[in-house]
């Protein structure tokens, strides 16, 4: 069996070497010639997998180590009898950590109390849904817009217009859909962006084209009160340099790039592959993940809650480093800038998730205990 895979997928040998030969390619370089003799194709979001890539090939299973599937032509897969799997939720926790880190940075810049903000989450799937649970757990006011879930479940969802009118912070977590009943391409267009509240914060860690980047650039030029945090870009790896300069935080599509999330994505497509072949799983992710480099953090019961929140979140992730690295990589030379974008992702430093963090409390502190629980960290006793 020949397995063609994106070279940046972690643990390929650990999970797939037992099935046959693995050939690795840069994700953007996987083409019809490299896929022609493959039985299995393993990709990330940078590889468009469609008829043009696979027609005439031997590929019968496609796995993408991502939550999103907008780079896969699922209609063609159905017609061609190609089995496929994505990795829903694999990096959800990493994205939540990214959003929390961004909120802390913006709060420091603006001198605002995060407890007093109103949060709007657009898209409440694996990522957005987890973010909503964390924000609710912290006791913050959250409004949620998800027309797909609203139609199937009912519940306390609101319209996008309500989010724009009432929320100080808007975090986008939708898939990219160009058509259908609920398209998300340019969900925030010029008109929608113009209705942002004074002093609004906009975070996009979903897909670049969910926001009209040209319209956002023009808005930020006109309104200094609005802060934008962009991890995803229209046309990436090429980036609108002026827009990046106008963003308060700008990063190269790494919001979900925790070590745990990336390895979890590989594990999920391995599990789907085993189910497709009707074989038992021989490898477990729990046996491969390294121990958390930070053993534990201890907090005094009288610690300031705002300080404690920042300490815990930044113990695992602070977006300011990624922002600085990204800005240093930006170049007027398009080819150089595109290459730098991919290199930052390829050589991304090890980053763990807050759920692997152990936190000890010295003394009785119900508010801090609730915060630790909401963040998903492990509350442990202090001797």
Swiss-Prot record:
Upper lineage: Bacteria, Pseudomonadati, Pseudomonadota, Gammaproteobacteria, Pseudomonadales
UniProt enzyme class: oxidoreductase
Subunit structure: Homodimer.
GO MF annotation list: 4-phosphoerythronate dehydrogenase activity; NAD binding; protein dimerization activity
Protein location: Cytoplasm
Name of this chain's protein: Erythronate-4-phosphate dehydrogenase
Organism: Pseudomonas entomophila (strain L48)
Catalytically driven reaction(s): 4-phospho-D-erythronate + NAD(+) = (R)-3-hydroxy-2-oxo-4-phosphooxybutanoate + NADH + H(+)
Pathway the protein contributes to: Cofactor biosynthesis; pyridoxine 5'-phosphate biosynthesis; pyridoxine 5'-phosphate from D-erythrose 4-phosphate: step 2/5
GO biological process, one term: pyridoxine biosynthetic process
């Amino acid at each position: 069996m020949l397995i063609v895979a994106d070279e940046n997928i972690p643990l390929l040998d650990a999970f797939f070497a037992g099935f046959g030969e693995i050939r690795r390619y840069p994700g953007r370089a996987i083409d019809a010639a490299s896929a022609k003799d493959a039985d299995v194709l393993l990709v990330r979001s940078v590889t468009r997998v469609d008829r043009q890539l696979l027609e005439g090939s031997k590929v019968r299973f496609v796995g993408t180590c991502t939550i999103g599937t907008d780079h896969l032509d699922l209609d063609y897969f159905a017609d061609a009898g190609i089995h496929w799997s994505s990795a829903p939720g694999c990096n959800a926790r990493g994205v939540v950590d990214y959003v929390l880190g961004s909120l802390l940075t913006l709060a420091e810049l603006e001198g605002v109390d995060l407890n007093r903000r109103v949060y709007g989450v657009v898209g409440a799937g694996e990522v957005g849904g987890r973010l909503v649970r964390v924000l609710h757990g912290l006791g913050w006011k959250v409004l949620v817009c998800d027309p797909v879930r609203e139609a199937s479940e009912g519940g306390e969802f609101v319209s996008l217009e309500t989010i724009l009118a009432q929320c100080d912070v808007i975090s986008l977590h939708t898939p990219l859909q160009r058509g259908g009943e609920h398209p998300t391409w340019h969900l925030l267009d010029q008109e929608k962006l113009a209705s942002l509240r004074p002093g609004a914060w906009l975070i996009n860690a979903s897909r670049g084209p969910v926001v009209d980047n040209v319209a956002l650039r023009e808005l930020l030029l006109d309104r200094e009160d609005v802060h934008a945090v962009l991890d995803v870009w229209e046309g990436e790896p090429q980036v609108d340099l002026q827009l990046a300069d106008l963003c308060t935080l700008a990063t190269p599509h790494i919001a979900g790039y925790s070590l745990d999330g990336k390895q979890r994505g590989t594990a999920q497509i391995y599990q789907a592959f085993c189910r497709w072949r009707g074989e038992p799983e021989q490898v477990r992710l729990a046996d491969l993940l390294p121990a958390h480099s930070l053993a534990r953090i201890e907090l005094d019961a009288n610690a300031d809650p705002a300080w404690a929140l920042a300490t815990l979140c930044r113990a695992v992730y602070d977006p300011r480093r990624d922002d600085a690295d990204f800005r240093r990589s930006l170049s007027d030379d398009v080819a150089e800038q595109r290459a730098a974008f991919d290199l930052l992702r390829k050589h991304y430093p090890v980053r763990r998730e807050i759920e692997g963090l152990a936190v000890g409390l010295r003394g009785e502190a119900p508010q801090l205990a609730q915060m630790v629980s909401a963040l998903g960290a492990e509350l442990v006793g202090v001797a």
